[in-house]
Amino acid sequence: MHFTSQQHLDDGVLEREFALGEIPGILWTPASASAPVPLILLGQPPLGLRKMYPRLVARARHSAAEGFATATIELPGSGARPRWPAVEQARADLRRAMDAGEPVSDEIIDALILPLVEKAVPEWQAALDALLSLPEVGGPVGYSGGVISIGIRLAVVEPRIVAASFFAGSFVPRAMFEEARQITIPLHVLLQWDDEGNDRQAALDLFDAFNSKEKSLHANMGGHTGVPQFAGDAAAQFFTRHLKVRPGRQTGSRG
């Protein structure tokens, strides 16, 4: 990993763009940090870092104010990364089905999501290796947002992640429900009740499948982009509980 640019934002947060091989990413660290700080991995939809930047930097600033470093990486096939023909075809099939008012088949969902999970999760793990080697970044580590299936796989295979905040707003292959049953870390799940592109019952079934002793579902009225401001405050409180180590207190257990 090497840094390609850096700037101090107006609130003092240090923003550094980096490259991990062909994978672009961004790291944000608090201005006031005098010791290694906990890290939150910021998931994002496959729309590209540049398009998602305003939302990502807002999340990063909010987290920095709570004493967390945050980082994100460009997903495979997104942004400036090479196109991925199979996934592009699946996206076209998805748009065609939704425009026609037809149910989205399991085959389309599998073709859209499963290859992304298989490729993105090892990339996230490689990024985590590199980020935790930096003197200013320490543990514990949390994961927040993005494609929920990527978060599920990461929570299953990556022991350094001790807590996760998921957004139940994307299609989930049936195979991921089995993986969800293996998750035991604390979870904070956000659901937009009127999300036009999300199967509400499937989201509730997925929440039920999580095997975590501590899991909370935060449902708000409104569509996919209508997440209220206070929802971010609740997620911040969740990570403060589980990533800020206090004397005599353990971080979230993996079971």
Go through the PLM ranges and name each one.
Residues E118-Q182:
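Primarily recognizes the serine-hydrolase "nucleophile elbow" in alpha/beta-hydrolase
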Residues M221-G222, V227-G255:
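Catalytic active-site module of serine/aspartate enzymes centered on a nucleophile-bearing elbow/loop
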Residues I40-S133:
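Serine-hydrolase catalytic machinery in alpha/beta-hydrolase-like enzymes
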Residues W193-N198, T225-G226:
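Acidic catalytic loop of the alpha/beta-hydrolase fold
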Residues M1-P38:
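N-terminal cap/lid segment of alpha/beta-hydrolase-fold proteins
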Residues R174-A175, E196-A202:
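Conserved alpha/beta-hydrolase "acid-adjacent" motif
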Residues A203-L204, D208-G226:
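Catalytic histidine neighborhood in serine/cysteine hydrolases
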Residues I183, V189-L191:
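Short beta-strand/loop motif that positions the catalytic acidic residue
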